[in-house]
Amino acid sequence: MTDVLLCVGNSMMGDDGAGPLLAEKCAAAPKGNWVVIDGGSAPENDIVAIRELRPTRLLIVDATDMGLNPGEIRIIDPDDIAEMFMMTTHNMPLNYLIDQLKEDIGEVIFLGIQPDIVGFYYPMTQPIKDAVETVYQRLEGWEGNGGFAQLAVEEE
């Protein structure tokens, strides 16, 4: 059983570096049996590598504007990503990436961390660093949604 953690984001853009920071923490001191991939700002480039691992579970972590307080963490239903037109800094919408992978992977979990400041050369804010630490600590023994709440998408 292979679990893959895909960390997404740009460490040069303030809070968008949440994913890469998580990848760094895992590289320094692994938690659980996750195969960690730092997808950076072009995670679509890792589709083939992820498929070759044939994971049972894929956890994608990214800073995502969900309209919450900075540092809040939510599980986002992959089907909601396109509808919400989530603001990400990546070349390709993450729902495309998920659609490419979910045929081959049993479980795809998308975990969003609400950023505060996303801009070139801004430092990462403390609430985001704290959120990354929370996610990192929960990786070992991760079950289901890792104890994180599901994002409630408001009906228009």
Swiss-Prot record:
Pfam families listed in its UniProt record: HycI
E.C. no: 3.4.23.51
Result for mutant: residue 90 to Q: A little protease activity remaining
Enzyme class: hydrolase
Residues that, per the record, bind Ni(2+): 16, 62, 90
InterPro entries recorded: Pept_A31_hyd_mat_HycI (IPR004420), Pept_HybD-like_dom_sf (IPR023430), Peptidase_A31 (IPR000671)
Keyword Hydrolase: yes
GO MF annotations, alphabetized: aspartic-type endopeptidase activity; endopeptidase activity; enzyme activator activity; metal ion binding
Keyword Nucleotidyltransferase: no
Record-linked CDD domains: H2MP_MemB-H2evol
GO biological process, alphabetically ordered: protein processing
UniProt-listed SUPFAM superfamilies: HybD-like (SSF53163)
Top-level taxon: Bacteria
This protein's UniProt keywords: Aspartyl protease, Hydrolase, Metal-binding, Nickel, Protease
Gene3D superfamilies: HybD-like
Subunit structure and binding partners: Monomer.
Family to which the UniProt record says this protein belongs: Belongs to the peptidase A31 family.
Function: Protease involved in the C-terminal processing of HycE, the large subunit of hydrogenase 3.
Protein name (database record): Hydrogenase 3 maturation protease
